[in-house]
Amino acid sequence: MNILNLIDVVNIIKSEKIIFVTGVTGQDGSHMVEYLLNNTNYFIVGGVRRLSTYNTVNFKNLINHPKKDRFLLTNFDLNDASCINCIVKELKPDYFINFAAQTFVGSSWDFSTYTWECNTTGVVHILEAIRQHNPTCRFYNAGSSEEYGNVEYVPQDEKHPLKPRSPYGASKAAARHIVKVYRESYNLYAIQGLLYNHEGTRRGEEFVTRKITKGVARIKKSLIEGKPFNSIELGNVYAKRDWSDAEDFVDAIWRMLNQEKYRIDFDSHMQIQEYVVSSNETHTIKEFVEMAFAAAGIKGGWHGNGTSEEYSISVADAMKYDPINSVLVKINPKFY
């Protein structure tokens, strides 16, 4: 898909209703675009960073979409206040959905300033542009369970205090406070959902779930072809996570942006609310490993302790495939 300049986008859309979505090349943004095309009649404009090349793999489902012509791309940069001002002023979107961010907890320690600029200051740029040029625009910013940090009780709810323990979590928690300030001070429809882990086929391979599923697929292929394979290397397999389906989450986000339609208890005098979105169930990474291999028809078992623990192919499957390497998963301390 071509990235259009803002003037061309304005000329194409004219007076149509618009939803502006950032982070559209990622998992959540691409699912959001597809959801909106399927469920609304809005023109969808996606914001992408000014790069000579960008990843379009998550757009493959849109190639033959009957409403693909109602999805356009234009340049966007969270750290460029003038760019954001122009977009909000010229397009006057009805909704502004922000998934753009520095999203990696580990990287936030090495790039704390950049993380803050993207995840907090960038949100201020958007809110200020909306306040000045399009105050009826509804704004959603993606939050994270990392905002909770050191939790006080389980399960966490909307009233749980925010005690982030990483620069990433702190940047998202600060953004939440900024969103609240603008909502209450300027009467904006501005919210930040608090999202737990949500997965899917568009999840980046740097996340543990995709690392596991891609690894399982690679190992299965190697077993069938009788070729050697590298074990999947993981950190603490006893860590628990709350995982959900990313497609369910974009539906929840749309409902948060339209509470008068979806809240039975809603009336015009009520404050809009921010919500935690989760499955309310936790599972260990170990369980995820077992289920992923089971889905691929590979049986295995755990043995060893601590960093010496391994998940190896079962005797029955070893006889079936006669693998060169029997260790499917091993622990690497660097991933703790």
Regions found by a protein language model. Give the residues of each.
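N-terminal Rossmann-like NAD(P)+-binding domain of SDR-like oxidoreductases, especially those catalyzing
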Residues: M1-H198, E247, I253-L257, K286, ...
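Alpha-helix boundary/capping detector
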Residues: T113-Y114, G122, R165, V208, ...
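Heptad-repeat alpha-helical coiled-coil signaling segments
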Residues: N197, T201-G204, Y238-R241
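C-terminal substrate-binding subdomain of Rossmann-fold SDR/epimerase-dehydratase oxidoreductases
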Residues: I13, N39-N41, G46-G47, F76-D77, ...
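A glycine/serine/threonine-rich, flexible loop-to-helix segment
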Residues: V154, E205-T213
